[in-house]
Amino acid sequence: MNFVIALLFAVTAPQSELVMLLEASHNHSASIVETPEGDLLVAWFHGQGEKGDDTLIIQGARKTKGAESWSAPFVMADNPGLPDQNPVLYVDRAGALHLWWISALANTRETYFLQHGASTDFEGDGAPVWNWNGFITQSPQNLPDVMDRMAAGVEKKFGADFDSEPKYRERLVHGQRMARFDETYIDDWDEPVLGRLTGMLSWMPRCQPITLRDGRLAIGLYSDVYMTSLTGFTADGGKTWSFGEPMADYGLIQPALAQRKDGTLVAYGRDKGPRKRIRVAESDDAGQTWKRFYDLPVENPDSSLSVTILSSGNWVMICNDLNGVDGRHGRSRLVAMLSEDEGRTWKKRRVLEDSTTPPEYHPHFAYPTVIQTRDGLIHVAYTYTPLEESIKHMWFDEAWLRDVDGSE
């Protein structure tokens, strides 16, 4: 009897492993899924830099159910001669695997080109066999008006902090002018971009999509040109897309989506503004428009985060909770937080990684993706950079995360 009780209350403390050996190459922005047969698939981008590196490719690896280690990396996607970045994996309710990623056509943030592939043949060894690949161009609703509303609100939201560094105002002005396809501005600009193409391009994925209560798939997209985010929707497995209105809130990017039982869609974002707090937006129409914007009382060092809803109904978030200006590298601590009220408060916090190595060594643990597998375990894949780089995989259960009084 005591043995049974012990099993019922057993706690799985964090365990971890490297997906591949540490190496000098840049390995970043991991995404992870569980396949219908119980394997784990992870994807990331690999190369020597970011948008200026035309050798960047999307790599992947597989951990077969019951295996002790990950497979050797394989190529998931590659547009030769273009930098491929920000892969996002997702398995939909029909059991199809999806991959989104971007290529920088002219090595600029204005020319990020969003692509999408789907596969029903991905359970064997090696890379998925893609049934089809498509390109996604956006037509953001009311973009000039959104940018004007954003500009009108920055003083009220940020006060003098908004002009604490010139980059905030410069990015805002650039986004406003690009939203209006200002031909004079474009003629004077020294980078290759043409008018409305920036509105159609420049939007990137980072966090996994969700399936809305109405059955549509929704993915958060963001732009470093407009310094904001929007939602993309598909009801046919990614063959056709529609897009909501961008958020009129400066600096909320890389949105991680979750939907409450009452239908409210919540987006948690990286902070590209001056406050260095986790940003939040709420929508009453499933991401078509966004009405409420506020900050969590959790620091964010301009770094990505991830959210998922657990089978218990509780929400889990993986994030860096430093501000990046306190003498430590902002991404040198990674934490898991638990919400028991659908993301309104986050009262449980556990540290997953913590390095006090001097900032000049740039240790970081960042860009996480979190999922829960069918056995109840919580899995996190993230960039792991003590000195060289790899992708790290960590797993634990909700009981371990819940078994803490407040923040550590």
Q: Which residues are covered by each model-predicted region?
A:
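Asp-box/BNR beta-propeller blade signature and adjacent active/binding-site loops
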Residues: 11-408
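Sec-dependent signal peptide recognition
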Residues: 1-7
